[in-house]
């Protein structure tokens, strides 16, 4: 049985973030959740969390950067499109035991579906490795730009138009 759980961190406490951190062996800082306005989608199979992905609206991310007084174009290597009707998809994680079984594709499908429901015009993401690049490319995302982030790591900016 597959259950899909949605958590809007704006309305929930840190428990879901703690659970996500433990499930995927990362710290809260590595999850890089943005100011309690992230939608976290978890995929649960037989009561076990096997994957998760995060979405934030471009407007919310942009507003957050302004409040921090950060450069509009870059925040820790995250580049934004200037259009307002977009969703940023990030922090996709799949439990190592379930990799290679289409979990990442399913999480991405759900993210695109939620983005359509929310009336976003496009989604975008940053791919930091060949596996994530392949997953997004397979789903129909286009390469927009390649660059190095503030940590000198190669990044691909990829986009997907929903309309």
Give the location of each predicted region.
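Conserved GNAT acetyl-CoA-binding A-motif
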Residues: 115-128
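Conserved acetyl-CoA-binding loop-helix of GNAT-fold acetyltransferases
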Residues: 94, 100-113, 138
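Conserved acyl-donor/pantetheine-binding loop and adjacent beta-alpha core of acyl/acetyltransferases
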Residues: 49-91, 151
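Short alpha-helical
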Residues: 11, 130-131
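Conserved short alpha-helix immediately C-terminal to the canonical SAM/SAH-binding motif I
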Residues: 107, 131-132
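Conserved catalytic-core motifs of GNAT/GCN5-like acyltransferases
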Residues: 124-126, 142-157
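Residue-level recognition of the GNAT/N-acetyltransferase active site
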Residues: 90, 95, 128
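Short amphipathic alpha-helix that is part of the acyltransferase structural core
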Residues: 1-30, 35-59
